[in-house]
């Protein structure tokens, strides 16, 4: 019923005059479906999974006011509300956003599922720097010979928790600067403060990429510090290379061989645990053990890139001595079909 309602609403064309300028009020319906098969080579076990079934609705009410609402009907089998915000753009280059959103932080963690290069996200994007929250941001884009985009915001700092009775006296923020340099180069710097429990967590991220002539080369480093020395600082790295090979008169429009290295030290999610359960009488524990990973693979594009892709990856994990690997964080072969509409 929800999908049917979205589709009916999106199919209704509406327009309005705004200061003499015609505004298309027709809502735009988008979606991303990712179905995959994974086989863990050491355990000899496999599984099918719907990783995402996202549906979003966005549009404009006036030339100043826009909106977006996005849900995931199957985020590893769970329904989640992802984005729900209103955006105001009073003048060119300046925008104000309020609601629930992905915070402006990092490069890889800010990618939507259809924009990912690999079937499974990097450690930065999945464990260390993946934060959605409720708050407000201010963004400003300008040009100094090359484009610059600045974003900063204040948030609850607790993630997507029960918002009804959540109150805080903490200032939780995120800030990000992107420099779109000539010849396909980009430098991105960002920082974020959160407080998921009783300990403040500061994160600092620096990354750069080159995107031109079929190449995408990217490297990113994230440093995560816990207040009151509650947990050792976390270091995380993500680096990868992808090259597009266009094809003609073929089922695929291009193929893209790619390789990635990522690493993370022992990581805590910032919550206190006692006897394996969240408990305010406990302390911060290791939720993700130190590991590195090599990922190699090929992406087959059936249409435009990031519209209909088949991602074939192999992941090789390297854990530190004494580490405990989670059931789904082991050597595996992954075949994923991604469709964006």
Residue spans for each PLM region:
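Outer membrane beta-barrel
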Residues: 19-159, 169-173, 177-186, 240-242, ...
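Active-site cleft segment of glycoside hydrolase catalytic domains centered on the general acid/base Glu
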Residues: 163-167
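Compositionally biased regions
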Residues: 6-7, 16, 175, 187-189
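Intrinsic disorder/low-structure terminal segments
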Residues: 5-8, 47, 154, 239, ...
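Outer-membrane beta-barrel pore domains
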Residues: 41-43, 62, 87-89, 109-111, ...
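N-terminal periplasmic/intermembrane-space "pro-region" immediately following the signal or transit peptide
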Residues: 2-34, 341
């Amino acid at each position: 019923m929800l999908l049917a309602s979205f589709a009916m609403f999106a199919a209704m064309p509406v327009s309005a005059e705004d200061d003499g300028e015609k505004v298309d009020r027709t809502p735009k319906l988008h979606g991303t479906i990712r179905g995959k098969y994974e086989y863990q080579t050491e355990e000899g076990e496999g599984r099918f999974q719907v990783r995402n079934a996202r549906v979003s609705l966005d549009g404009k009410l006036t030339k100043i006011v826009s909106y977006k609402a996005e849900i995931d009907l199957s985020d590893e089998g769970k329904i989640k509300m992802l984005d729900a915000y209103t955006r105001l753009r009073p003048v060119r280059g300046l925008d104000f956003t309020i609601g629930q959103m992905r915070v402006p932080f990092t490069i890889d963690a800010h990618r939507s599922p259809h924009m990912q290069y690999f079937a499974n996200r990097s450690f930065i994007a999945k464990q260390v720097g993946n934060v959605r929250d409720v708050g407000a941001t201010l963004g400003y884009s300008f040009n100094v010979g090359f484009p610059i985009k600045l974003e900063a915001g204040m948030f609850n700092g607790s993630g997507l928790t029960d918002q009804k009775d959540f109150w805080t006296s903490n200032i939780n923020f995120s800030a990000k600067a992107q420099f779109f340099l000539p010849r396909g180069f980009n430098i991105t710097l960002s920082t974020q403060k959160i407080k998921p429990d009783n300990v403040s967590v500061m994160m600092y991220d620096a990354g750069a990429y080159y995107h031109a002539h079929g190449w995408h080369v990217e490297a990113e480093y994230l440093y995560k510090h816990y207040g009151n020395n509650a947990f050792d600082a976390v270091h995380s790295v993500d680096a990868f290379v992808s090259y597009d090979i266009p094809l003609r008169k073929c089922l695929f429009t291009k193929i893209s061989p790619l390789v990635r290295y990522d690493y993370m030290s022992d990581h805590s999610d910032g919550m206190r645990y006692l006897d394996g359960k969240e408990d305010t009488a406990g302390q911060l524990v290791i939720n993700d053990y130190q590991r590195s990973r090599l990922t190699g693979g090929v992406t087959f594009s059936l249409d435009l890139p990031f519209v209909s892709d088949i991602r074939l990856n192999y992941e090789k994990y390297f854990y530190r001595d004494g580490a405990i690997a989670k059931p789904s964080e082991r050597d595996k072969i992954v075949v994923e079909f991604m469709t964006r509409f």
